[in-house]
C-alpha cells in the first residue's frame, strides 16, 4: 500500500492539491503514471531510463523531474533529460537519468530518490475557478557499485534478529538497502521498514505478540515481494 502526503498549493489563477506518493505505471482512468516503483543505477552504466505515461484521453500534463538526496535536497550529481516537457494525452515518454557526480561508496549501495511532478494544463476558460490535481511521484533510486560479494537475491536471508525485554533488533549485515514488508513479530503485523546497509533497526514488541519470532518478505529490484523468510538469530 502506498502512502501519500497532501499539501495545498495556491496560485493566482489556480488552486491545486499536490499529492506526493509512490507511483506505479497504472494511473487509473486518467493521469500520469511511472513504469517502475524503484530504479537501480549500476556502476558503469552510462544512463538509465524511466517511462512516464499520460493515460488521460484529453488532458496534457507538464512534467518536471529531478533527483533528491535522502534529506530531501535536489542532487546536482544527476542529470535528467528532458527535465521539463509537455506530455500529451494518451502518450508516453522516457526520462533518461545520468550520474555525473564524484565516485560513491564502493562497498555498499547509495540511496537517492527520483521525483516526477505532473501538472495538468488549464485552458483560458478554466482559469480562476477550476480545481486541478498536480501529482508528485517519488520513487527510490539505488546506486549500486560493481563487485559486491553477492547479488541482492541472496541478501534477505542474511538478516539477523535478536530480542531483549520488549525490543526486537533486526540487523542488516549486507551492502544492500533492504525493505521489509509483511513483517510480523510474534505473529503480529508491524509497519514496513527499510534498513540501510550494515545497519540495524529496533522494533518494539507488539501488544499481544506470542513471542519474539520474526517473519518477513522483502522487495526486489522489480518492486515485487520475495518469499516469506524466518529471521535467524
Curated annotation (Swiss-Prot):
InterPro entries named in the record: Ig-like_fold, PapD-like_sf, Periplasmic_pilus_chap, Pili_assmbl_chap_C_dom_sf, Pili_assmbl_chaperone_bac, Pili_assmbl_chaperone_C, Pili_assmbl_chaperone_CS, Pili_assmbl_chaperone_N
Compartments where found: Periplasm
Pfam families per the UniProt record, alphabetical: PapD_C, PapD_N
Signal peptide extent: 1-26
One Gene Ontology cellular component: outer membrane-bounded periplasmic space
Main subcellular location of this protein, as a coarse class: periplasm
Transmembrane residue ranges: none
Keyword annotations from UniProtKB, A to Z: Chaperone, Fimbrium biogenesis, Periplasm, Signal
Record carries keyword Nucleotide-binding: no
BP-aspect Gene Ontology terms: cell wall organization; chaperone-mediated protein folding
UniProt function note: Part of the elfADCG fimbrial operon, which could be required for adherence to host epithelial cells. Could be required for the biogenesis of the ElfA fimbriae.
Protein family (similarity comment): Belongs to the periplasmic pilus chaperone family.
Name under which the protein is recorded: Probable fimbrial chaperone protein ElfD
Amino acid at each position: 500500500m502506498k502512502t501519500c502526503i497532501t499539501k495545498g498549493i495556491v496560485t493566482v489563477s489556480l488552486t491545486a492539491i499536490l499529492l506526493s506518493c509512490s507511483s506505479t505505471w497504472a494511473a487509473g482512468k486518467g493521469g500520469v503514471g511511472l513504469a517502475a516503483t524503484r530504479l537501480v543505477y549500476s556502476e558503469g552504466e552510462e544512463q538509465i531510463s524511466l517511462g512516464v505515461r499520460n493515460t488521460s484521453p484529453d488532458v496534457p500534463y507538464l512534467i518536471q523531474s529531478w533527483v533528491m538526496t535522502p534529506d530531501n535536497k535536489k542532487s546536482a550529481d544527476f542529470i535528467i533529460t528532458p527535465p521539463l516537457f509537455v506530455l500529451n494525452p494518451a502518450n508516453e515518454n522516457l526520462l533518461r537519468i545520468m550520474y555525473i557526480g564524484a565516485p560513491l561508496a564502493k562497498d555498499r549501495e547509495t540511496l537517492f530518490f527520483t521525483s516526477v511532478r505532473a501538472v495538468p494544463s488549464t485552458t483560458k476558460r478554466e482559469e480562476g475557478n477550476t480545481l486541478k490535481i498536480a501529482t508528485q511521484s517519488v520513487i527510490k533510486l539505488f546506486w549500486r557499485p560493481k563487485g559486491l560479494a553477492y547479488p541482492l537475491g541472496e541478501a534477505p536471508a542474511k538478516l539477523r534478529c535478536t530480542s531483549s525485554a520488549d525490543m526486537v533488533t533486526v540487523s542488516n549485515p549486507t551492502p544492500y538497502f533492504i525493505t521489509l514488508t509483511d513483517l510480523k513479530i510474534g505473529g503480529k503485523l508491524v509497519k514496513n521498514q527499510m534498513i540501510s546497509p550494515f545497519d540495524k533497526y529496533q522494533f518494539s514488541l507488539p501488544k499481544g505478540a506470542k513471542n519474539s519470532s520474526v517473519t518477513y518478505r522483502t522487495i526486489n529490484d522489480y518492486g515485487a515481494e520475495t518469499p516469506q523468510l524466518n529471521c535467524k538469530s
